[in-house]
Amino acid sequence: MYAVIKTGGKQYRVASGEKIKVEQIAADVGQEIVIDQVLAVGNGSEIKIGTPLVSGATVTVTVLSHGKHDKVGIFKMRRRKHYQKRQGHRQQFTELQIGAIAG
């Protein structure tokens, strides 16, 4: 069974037992969270597509860890003006273990 969930402004296709990295969620490590923003649920032979959400469908996840992605380098430059600017960014993430998919 699989589901399409929405969290952090993005959509993810998940199945039970998978591990995914999503935008940071304010939750403690080891805590169970119920995600109710489920856009679609399928089991191979049939699929339920929400308008926009599937009513009564939930996905239970467990928070495994928090961390930061690799650094992305940003370099801005204006030609002939002696202007150069360097910057970096590390996006924070939460790693989730997908549990039960209901609905």
UniProtKB/Swiss-Prot annotation:
Pfam families in the record: Ribosomal_L21p
Superkingdom of source: Bacteria
Any GO BP: translation
Keywords, ordered alphabetically: Ribonucleoprotein, Ribosomal protein, RNA-binding, rRNA-binding
One of the record's GO cellular component terms: ribonucleoprotein complex
The keyword RNA-binding is annotated on this UniProt entry: yes
GO molecular function terms attached to this record: rRNA binding; structural constituent of ribosome
Subunit-level organization: Part of the 50S ribosomal subunit. Contacts protein L20.
Function, as annotated: This protein binds to 23S rRNA in the presence of protein L20.
NCBIfam families: L21
UniProt similarity note: Belongs to the bacterial ribosomal protein bL21 family.
Protein name, per record: Large ribosomal subunit protein bL21
Lineage of source species: Bacteria, Pseudomonadati, Pseudomonadota, Betaproteobacteria, Burkholderiales
UniProt gene name: rplU
